[in-house]
Design a protein with these regions (language model features):
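Hydrophobic h-region of N-terminal signal peptides that target proteins for export
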Residues: 10-17
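Positively charged n-region of N-terminal signal peptides that target proteins for export
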Residues: 1-4
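Carbohydrate-active catalytic/glycan-binding domains of CAZyme proteins
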Residues: 18-321
Length: 321
């Protein structure tokens, strides 16, 4: 009995001399189609892949955009529609609802789930898509007058970006408002290394009464996958593509750069998170990077500046010296 207590005492004393420290678990952020939300001074990232708990979406958090920590699983397949193909999540805090909304794709259908915290767990009260037609890549925009719009991809002529007004419940659209926004038309949007009519990954911003639709084009496996934008005086278009597109393509030695989203930073500036190919010879796994995003006084959007390569931290214990 005394030996048992002595062993326990020695174990406790050894633990007192230990402490945890942050260590680099991954030297990259393991998500594609990434999205970042700033909430109460902390950044939260979501994307395709990166989960360690089965189908669904992971959540990562950061104070500085460089070092990230894995949070709990944000959404699990058991709590939502679909069993495969969980892609392109975007999370919004809707003040009028006091809820977080996660818009995403599953089984090539667009869905939405809700939670009380940015980490989740996000769940669907009724496990069903927003509408029956196959679609992907949702992005929510709520205008100054409170009208909600949903932008997403339909397979009408390749991948084509459409918009529709949402009902106030934010779980369904008004089909009669469906409007085509962006399709492949420009030479840069149809790269010959992997020709495919793909316009996808929409994001919407508004500045000085002008609406900006940021999108990606080309097949995601193409080395020339890139980002462009179009402008309009209305959230439903018509949209005029910027003559200087693409504004992001083959940057900083990276290939396949695109399908990201602009987000506001703590200091009020903007940045753009996007994914790229693993390296110059392999597409998968795609990983995420961050660059600056701005709209000039002349209304020109740009993605530039120094690049941030995020890393994921874990913890390890060490003995005090």
């Amino acid at each position: 009995m005394k030996k048992k207590y002595l062993s326990l005492l020695l174990l406790c004393l050894s633990l007192v001399g230990c402490k945890t420290k942050a260590v680099v678990e991954l030297d990259y952020l393991p998500i594609a189609d990434p999205y970042v939300m700033l909430y109460e001074g902390k950044y939260y990232a979501y994307g395709t892949g990166g989960t360690v708990e089965g189908e669904g979406f992971a959540c990562f958090s950061s104070d500085d955009l460089k070092s990230w920590r894995r949070e709990s699983q944000a959404l699990s397949a058991t709590d939502s529609y679909g069993t495969w193909g969980f892609w392109a999540p975007e999370v919004y805090y809707v003040e009028s609802k006091k809820k977080f909304y996660l818009f995403y794709s599953a089984e090539e259908h667009i869905c939405v789930a809700t939670a009380d915290t940015p980490q989740g767990p996000f769940r669907q009260a009724v496990k069903q898509p927003i509408w029956d037609e196959k679609s992907i890549d949702t992005s929510l925009f709520i205008d100054d007058d409170g009208t909600p719009y949903l932008y997403f991809v339909r397979f009408t002529d390749g991948n084509v970006i459409w918009a529709a007004q949402m009902n106030d419940d934010l779980t369904s659209i008004k089909p009669e408002t469906l409007t085509e926004c962006i399709k492949v038309e420009e030479p840069w949007e149809l790269s010959q290394d992997k020709p495919a009519k793909v316009a996808e990954g929409p994001s919407i911003l508004k500045k000085d009464g002008v609406y900006y639709l940021v999108y990606s084009a080309n097949h995601f496996e193409s080395k020339n996958y890139g980002v462009g934008y179009a402008t309009s005086d209305s959230p439903m278009g018509p949209w005029k593509k910027y003559a200087g597109n693409p504004i992001l393509q083959r940057t900083d030695g990276l290939l396949g750069t695109g399908h990201g989203a602009p987000f506001r930073c703590k200091d009020g500036s903007w940045k753009y998170i996007f994914h790229a190919h693993w390296d110059t010879t392999k597409v998968q796994p795609r990983t995420s990077y961050i660059k600056g995003f701005a709209i000039s006084d002349h209304g020109v959007a740009s993605i530039d500046g120094s690049i941030i390569k995020p890393q994921v931290l874990g913890t390890a214990s060490k003995n005090n010296e």
